[in-house]
Amino acid sequence: MFTNLANSAKASVFFIIAFGLTVTVSLLYPLLGQLTPFIHMFTPMLSVLIMMLVVTRDGYSKAGWATLGLHRARLRWWLLALAGPLVVIGMVYGLVWSTGVAHAVVPDGLFTPAALASMLGSGLGLSCALAMGEEIGFRGYLLPRLMQLGTTRALLLSGLLHAIWHFPLMLLTPVYPIFGNWLIVGPIILLTLTAAGVFYGYLRLSSKSVWPATLAHGAINWFFALFAGLTVTASPLALEYLAGETGVLTLVATALGAGVILYRLRPRRGTLAIHLPAGV
């Protein structure tokens, strides 16, 4: 259809499609109900299929699919993908628990082999499966097509666009209940997700695989849910402003991590790149 689109044009069209799909899915919440967030998470992957099979037709060649980073597992990056989210979220909730705003409550039997196997399988496994739909779109397809901007700008822009893509679901549906002031919470979410995107993108570029980024994204969502489930507070609003994806502490920790990554990339600018074959 448009086989000679520049990478910048491909990135723009991809995001327009992905954003349009998530707005549509969000508006269909009265019909879709609890299926809405699950369908929403796969709209970026659907956008990739539309781009590669209909718009640019890159998907009719092996080289086209190779640019998504699906063919390498890169297991040696998986430890960092798990450890990074655990350290950040553990520190955030540890600080919250230490202030007395909230308290940790560990149910009996939580750390038995059976319970751990269940959490890892149905919890982390499902979270990663859902995150895959987003990561194939934003880190698999979009990020490589932004690399002509330079590594730092590409990482930040892919993270920012990913953050913006979340907003229709948050604003048009009750899927993500927000108790705080949106003028405060909205910018925090935007900046936190942008910073998290730097980490996902770093894993994608360093490993040349989308799977470490998928694992990191799934792990972050799962650890947020796990730590929130272990937390009891008399002030949900205070907790919302401090922890979770809407928390100031989460923003600070994530931004510091992103800052370290971007600083480390400065001397090696241009080395973390994905070179797309001509015409892809």
Q: What is each model feature region?
A:
Residues 1-7:
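Short, Lys/Arg-rich, polar N-terminal cytosolic tail immediately upstream
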Residues 2, 34-83, 94-112, 257-277:
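Membrane-helix interface linkers and caps
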Residues 133-164, 205-209:
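Membrane-interface helix/loop boundary segments of multi-pass membrane proteins
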Residues 156, 180-242:
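Functionally important transmembrane alpha-helices
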Residues 10-24, 43-48, 80-89:
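Alpha-helical transmembrane segments
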Residues 19-27, 86-94, 160-169, 218-230:
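Aromatic-anchored segments of alpha-helical transmembrane domains
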Residues 57, 218-280:
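C-terminal membrane module of polytopic membrane proteins
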